[in-house]
């Protein structure tokens, strides 16, 4: 047992933790069938130390090795809390190793790195010695187990010295060992193929592996070919290996032949030399009568890599076209057409000719499989080269002329091809539609209502692509016409064309929306479909289905149809199965930010709330009846059968209302998301909706089912991300007593304190809005200021919940910045109140004083103005610094997760940056007004023009998916537009604009910023 303690293989309960290949051990993924011998013990302990050191290295004297930090070392490294940066680690290194001078710090740190590298080399040397002992063993199992550790050694220590010694040793073993060990060495080469280029004597390694090809064993030759095929870049110009591969093509052993085709496929892809030397031989083998048909097909696929030069590509194309006449069977035609398509994709000059070839050959063939293959090849070409000359009329004719009851695969692939082409060739489709009396669009209308949902969703996608792309094109044309005012005749013609296109697009839009509503009523309701059709549609309609993506894209371009689509979905709440309804509400949640009032009308919210009551309470009541029935059966085994039949009938009558398989133990997160996104802009509405939702949530918490507590935690996160902090507070207060880990308890405690604090701040902002007097505002502001200190208590809990493998630095920085943000806004509000009081007092004094004292009063006013200007500039500097800190947090977050910061996190941080920039701009307006400067253009020291231009570009961007719909950003955009309107007023009307007081306007803006609900980004919550 001491042996397992040293190797860190004890689990939390004190038992031995066996390594597992599926779950993975702490370092290696070793199969649990292998015994934990001394080799595994040595390798696991050494690698546990080496793999944990990159993030938590503790600087020690050179004699000691690098190990995981102890509690004492944590105190010395972390110091002031948080993870130390590179600068702090180097300074500590200089203090330990010796010499405190600034010039000697890099040298001392290099000494420490060299010492650590020496320790790693010693550990690797020890591991290599143990592995060599296992390889020299006479037991085959120990040999294979030892070779297994070579790949792990290279992964965890990919230094050139280790890679060179390991690969050289494996090549020696490969030459003389059995086929079983050869196969294990092949796996090592395949797993470490990206590291083999570090070998210095690669020529010796290749020669030792190549020597096995000359043996009499076909299995050994095939293993040698596959080992060489795992490193094709190293043998791209090795002619002796190329010659051996061509020799192996004559083999009659199937295993060796497949290995030969494998290495030929790898080499033809990267080696022009090998491709040029092998193309004629491949063509000869395919034409040979003795070659099996399956082997001919495998050799035919090699032609897709013959694109390294124009001559090779042309020769390959001619050979493949000749093979079509030689082998007209369906299997050969399918492979040859696919190979020709892949070859054309690599050689762009052949794309247009290949499209014509597919149209003439594929569409004229009466076989269904050939037509489907031709359409699939055209789909590949449409994705790569969407602006080529595709036969659109012929594609519509295939859809129209193909029988409806059969050959649905042809229709599906033809519609899929049209959906791809409609994103780029929408103008051509509309022109051909007008030339054919609207016949093409009518075909899409017809198939959008087809009983086959796959065909209908592709038709809807094609129509939506035409609408969206044509709308963007018309908007661009209108902008160009407005910019070019010289050519009046051309402008009139363009305007007429745009008007005609707009009318056509509007009619297509209306018909498409009507068809979407018809699909919702006919495809997914239980009254119009049998169970088989609904089950088929369940599998196709999910969150990523083409139908829902098309609806989202259409609504993001034009939010008007959202009302009719929402009306249809809500009217069918009791008829659509819950599994489909989840996906539909998820689609609505993506569309609601474009039109937040869509659920807040016609009593739709009440209908949704009633549906939630039926869904949650009835489903749980059915489950309770089932549990009670099972308990009665266990306790009363001798009960009457008639009573059991009555209970069964009652149970079935209740369960018929809701399908238990659809909503088993689940919480309708998509419905809650729709509600949260609808009312997340108003604190007063948030409190009203919260009171209506709390009974449902408390019912779930009081009667939890399996996995529902985790769903409740996700619901709390979702509510906290949309300003419903009271819901999060109720859930966290229940979950905090149900976790086992102390770390999770502290994490929930921190989230609970944050939710409680945000809920109290929102309540104070509501009372401020109702009682809009100065005294009440001051009292509420002082209450909010008193609550800000509680942010630090939540930070303490979050810090206590942090662990070595996860950092909560972003959470701490975000909370601290938000606390500073609120504090500075409230501080600025109190300062503005003082300015208003001082201004009123000065006006009263000026009215009461005599004319003799006017000069003295003017001097005093000038002095007061200078003091106020300095204080205003200091406030402006504070918000600029706060803006820079938010920008720095955004940059750090994007770098820490490989430049893939979540969209909501980026938009929330940009919202705070925008608000700080807006406050700076308003303060600068006040400063200019105090200086009696009528110039509305503010210099660079007042406004961050780069930030303003970035948000204007952000607003005008074509990609609607990146628009920021968070309430804070929308409020700042509204204020920005107001300011731009004021600046656009000409100087002659300055008297009208001067009536607006900048100080009072800034005070109103600050009140609005306080009242906006606080939202938290998704990056704030880590994954368990």
Swiss-Prot record:
GO terms of biological process kind: RNA polymerase II transcription initiation surveillance; snRNA 3'-end processing
Record's compositionally biased regions (Polar residues): 1-11, 19-36
Domain of life from the UniProt record: Eukaryota
Compartment(s): Nucleus; Chromosome; Cytoplasm
Location of the region described as Disordered in the Swiss-Prot/TrEMBL record: 1-109, 472-502, 842-863
UniProt key word Membrane: no
Compositionally skewed regions (Low complexity) per UniProt: 44-77, 85-96, 473-502
Keyword Cytoplasm tagged: yes
Complexes and interactors: Component of the Integrator complex. The core complex associates with protein phosphatase 2A subunits, to form the Integrator-PP2A (INTAC) complex.
Family named by the database record: Belongs to the Integrator subunit 7 family.
Protein name in the entry: Integrator complex subunit 7 homolog
Species this chain originates from: Dictyostelium discoideum
The gene coding this protein: ints7
